[in-house]
Amino acid sequence: TAPITALRLEVLPDDRLPERGPGRCYYEGRKGDFFLSEFSVASKDRKWAIVNPTHSYGKISVGGGGANASNVIDGDGSSGWSTSGQTGKAHHLVLPLKEPIPANTKFSVQMLFERHFVVSLGRFRISVTSDLKSPVAKKHGAEVEAVLAHKPSSASKEQMNFLRRHYLESDPRWKKQRQPIDALR
């Protein structure tokens, strides 16, 4: 194994969550929303500094301020990251580390959801990389990246259909045609 240079937090939709998530908010605030105040990484003997985090999308529905990715490392529980207005859609936060976590080091992740009502995540995935280049969040998610990393000739029919669907769901030129379908979700 290799040292860990960054983490990615993916917030994922799920039909079992309010408004398909990715958050669990259901009685106050926008249904399906979440609000991540702080994200930290620690091992037995130290806390690992996160530098220059980025996100694929950010917007806060309640209160003032922006939804900058850097809010999750500022030590202020009243600031944070959310994807308000994008319920039922996947987004991600990329968190590069100032120094790599050595290979085979056990570590833990702590996420603080600090609002005056319940706004935790309902479905998420955390992945890591050992890439030495400082990774940044992209508009597409991990599944799209995995398919795009292969040669087009080696992609299966299902993978190509997945890419087509992703394109049609995300390209702004198709927004008008998507609206009736999006309204049904």
Q: Can you name each region flagged by the protein language model?
A:
Residues 3-41, 105-115, 126:
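A short beta-strand element within beta-rich, extracytoplasmic domains
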Residues 30-35, 75, 87-89, 118-120:
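A short, structural micro-pattern
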Residues 1, 12-17, 38-103, 150:
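Disordered, acidic Ser/Thr/Pro-rich linker "stalks" and the adjacent N-terminal cap
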Residues 15-16, 28-29, 46-57, 98-100, ...:
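Substrate/cofactor-recognition hotspot
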Residues 25, 63, 67, 79-81, ...:
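Residue-level detector of functional hotspots within protein domains
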Residues 10-11, 22-24, 63-70, 122-124, ...:
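Surface-exposed beta-strand edges and their flanking turn/coil or helix-capping segments
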Residues 21, 77, 108, 159, ...:
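Generic, low-specificity signal for short hydrophobic/alpha-helical stretches with a mild N-terminal bias
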